[in-house]
């Protein structure tokens, strides 16, 4: 376990609090709390932008910002509901983060969307003269910083952008933020798996509590030996 992961560990009291709403009612998360925590979706950075402050649960003595799992879960639900309204093949998921290559590819496969991993081809959204020009209806981005080219192009042509964002994120040109650890390998796998499953639930392609055949591990980028 890394030092950052140790800093992000929660006490039993904190875990109990995160399973209740602000009014004290017990809430049901999309996956068990411990599943979220073990994947590290809540682990932020040692900096926090003004916009992201509202998603922070705690600031550790070491200066690590810890995200509120309840808000991550809530935002995943809202994003899935929004994305379910689009024609599947018009949803484009993008990432330039290597740890997100597999999650994004599997996500697009499960929801029957499209994916661009690695370097985003400049002008692909804004220049109709390019042979590889595409016209998606919505973009799902992994990181507002590293996927800025795609996000800026989408903004220019009026394509809405849903993006995962850590505590240090600048969210210009992003229409809807899902606060989360968008740098960790296991975190990215779980986030994209949950989002994919919830989109299928919202489309009613699977029951409200139905499962998909793919496992979270199938969404995880493998480390090179």
Swiss-Prot record:
InterPro entries reported in the protein's UniProt record: Ribosomal_uS2, Ribosomal_uS2_arc, Ribosomal_uS2_CS, Ribosomal_uS2_euk/arc, Ribosomal_uS2_flav_dom_sf
Keyword terms: Ribonucleoprotein, Ribosomal protein
A single MF term (Gene Ontology): structural constituent of ribosome
GO biological process per UniProt: translation
Gene3D superfamilies: Glucose-6-phosphate isomerase like protein, domain 1
Gene Ontology CC: one annotated term: small ribosomal subunit
Pfam families: Ribosomal_S2 (PF00318)
Family the entry assigns: Belongs to the universal ribosomal protein uS2 family.
Full protein name: Small ribosomal subunit protein uS2
Organism: Sulfurisphaera tokodaii (strain DSM 16993 / JCM 10545 / NBRC 100140 / 7)
Lineage: Archaea, Thermoproteota, Thermoprotei, Sulfolobales, Sulfolobaceae
Protein encoded by which gene: rps2
């Amino acid at each position: 376990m890394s030092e950052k992961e140790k800093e992000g560990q929660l006490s039993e009291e904190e875990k109990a609090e995160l399973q209740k709403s602000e009014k004290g009612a017990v809430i049901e998360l999309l996956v068990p709390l411990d599943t979220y925590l073990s994947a590290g979706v809540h682990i932020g950075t040692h900096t926090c932008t003004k916009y992201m402050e509202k998603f922070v649960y705690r600031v550790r003595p070491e200066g690590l910002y810890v995200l509120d799992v309840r808000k991550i879960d809530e935002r995943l639900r809202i994003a899935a509901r929004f994305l379910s309204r689009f024609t599947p093949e018009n949803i484009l998921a993008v990432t330039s983060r290597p740890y997100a290559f597999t999650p994004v590819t599997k996500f697009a496969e499960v929801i029957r969307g499209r994916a661009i991993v690695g370097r985003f081809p400049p002008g692909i959204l804004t220049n109709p003269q390019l042979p590889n020009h595409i016209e998606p209806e919505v973009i799902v981005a992994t990181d507002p910083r590293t996927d800025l080219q795609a996000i800026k192009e989408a903004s220019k042509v009026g394509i809405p952008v849903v993006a995962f964002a850590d505590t240090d994120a600048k969210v210009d040109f992003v229409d809807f933020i899902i606060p989360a650890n968008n740098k960790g390998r296991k975190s990215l796998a779980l986030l994209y798996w949950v989002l994919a499953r919830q989109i299928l639930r919202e489309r009613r392609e699977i029951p409200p509590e139905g499962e998909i055949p793919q496992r979270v591990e199938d969404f995880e980028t493998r480390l090179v030996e």
